[in-house]
Amino acid sequence: VHLSGEEKAAVTGLWGKVDLEKVGGQSLGSLLIVYPWTQRFFDSFGDLSSPSAVMSNPKVKAHGKKVLTSFSDGLNHLDNLKGTFAKLSELHCDKLHVDPENFRLLGNVLVRVLACNFGPEFTPQVQAAFQKVVAGVANALAHKYH
């Protein structure tokens, strides 16, 4: 992903303020609610029967944090996203059989959750920079599918 110096500063500056557990749980929870077919990958998470059950589910929150922790690794290696996410791409492709379109959906949900959490601080410039990053991460995660 090619980001200008300003874009990198915007992304890393905001990301440093992100509560990974809170935003991760909100992002994964929102994905599971808005795109309910994604729930099939999380059979072991227990009750996902309603929006409130999803959003209060501790396994959703924990996995959301895990997802954003990996995303943080990507932010530290923007010039090598494919390498950074190679093992996760392989896992999601070969073992979990996740449709790679779900990575794009989760990226878009993450951008929306960040906007909700940071309000005016999430300027159009910050949003544009994050869109580039989530697109790059989604592409890297889909790499093994090609």
From Swiss-Prot:
Heme b binds at H63, H92. Residues 2-146 form the Globin domain. SUPFAM superfamilies: Globin-like. One of its GO terms (cellular component) is blood microparticle. Pfam families: Globin. One of its GO terms (molecular function) is organic acid binding. The modification S-nitrosocysteine is found at C93. The modification Phosphoserine is found at S44. The modification Phosphothreonine is found at T12. GO terms for biological process: hydrogen peroxide catabolic process. Red blood cells. Keywords: Acetylation, Heme, Iron, Metal-binding, Oxygen transport, Phosphoprotein, S-nitrosylation, Transport. The modification N6-acetyllysine is found at K59, K82, K144. Signal peptide: none annotated. The modification N-acetylvaline is found at V1. Involved in oxygen transport from the lung to the various peripheral tissues. Belongs to the globin family. Heterotetramer of two alpha chains and two beta chains. This is Hemoglobin subunit beta. The gene is HBB.
